[in-house]
């Protein structure tokens, strides 16, 4: 009987994830941001979108790499609009707040331009997401990003978004944030 218990314990131990690997961090969501002026921006040159903005975020963070995709499009009536798409290169999660950054892949004319996106998962009380922040060469707001961006993301938080936050349209979706486990 003791050999059976030992084998069972060994199988259970091997089935558990390695403590050195930790759990993956996650940020997922889709929705529509309300138009208007963002709340709590850090930068002084904030734009107030006149139209709703659709977004989609899928990001995963492992101990040694971050992957994912961000997409967004302005919902201008009667216009198809371009989808801005980028590969996620960094992710920083603190509690229910996340920031992701990377390089645009679409539209082609902006391929390689760094971007940043902030979000706060407030559960049923209403999530917040920032408008897409683009940082071409010479952009004055580049000083608000850490050295090494887009491989290293800035800190997230309600008062940390460079361009502030827009509320999600009720019933349009949401954001889910899970910090990585050590």
Regions picked out by a protein language model, each given a short descriptive name:
Residues 130-182:
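C-terminal partner/receptor-binding element of secreted or periplasmic proteins
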Residues 35, 46, 88, 150-152:
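Extracellular secreted precursors and ectodomains with disulfide-bonded cysteine-rich loops/domains
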Residues 40-123:
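Predominantly extracellular/secreted and cell-surface proteins with exposed
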Residues 68-72, 125-137:
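Short polybasic amphipathic segments
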């Amino acid at each position: 009987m003791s050999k059976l218990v030992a084998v069972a314990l060994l199988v259970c131990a091997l089935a558990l994830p390695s403590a050195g690997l930790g759990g993956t961090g996650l940020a997922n969501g889709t929705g529509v941001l309300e138009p208007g002026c963002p709340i709590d921006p850090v930068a002084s040159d904030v734009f107030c979108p006149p139209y709703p903005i659709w977004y989609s975020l899928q990001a995963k963070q492992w101990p040694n790499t971050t992957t994912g995709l961000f997409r967004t499009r302005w919902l201008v009536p009667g216009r198809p609009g371009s989808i801005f798409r980028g590969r996620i290169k960094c992710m920083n999660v603190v509690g229910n707040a996340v920031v992701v950054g990377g390089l645009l892949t679409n539209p082609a004319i902006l391929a390689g331009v760094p971007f940043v996106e902030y979000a706060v998962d407030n559960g049923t009380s209403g999530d917040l997401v920032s408008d897409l922040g683009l940082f071409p060469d010479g952009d004055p707001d580049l000083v608000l990003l850490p050295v090494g961006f887009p491989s290293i993301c800035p800190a997230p938080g309600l008062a940390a978004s460079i361009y502030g936050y827009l509320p999600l349209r009720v019933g349009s979706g949401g954001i889910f944030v899970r910090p990585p486990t050590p």
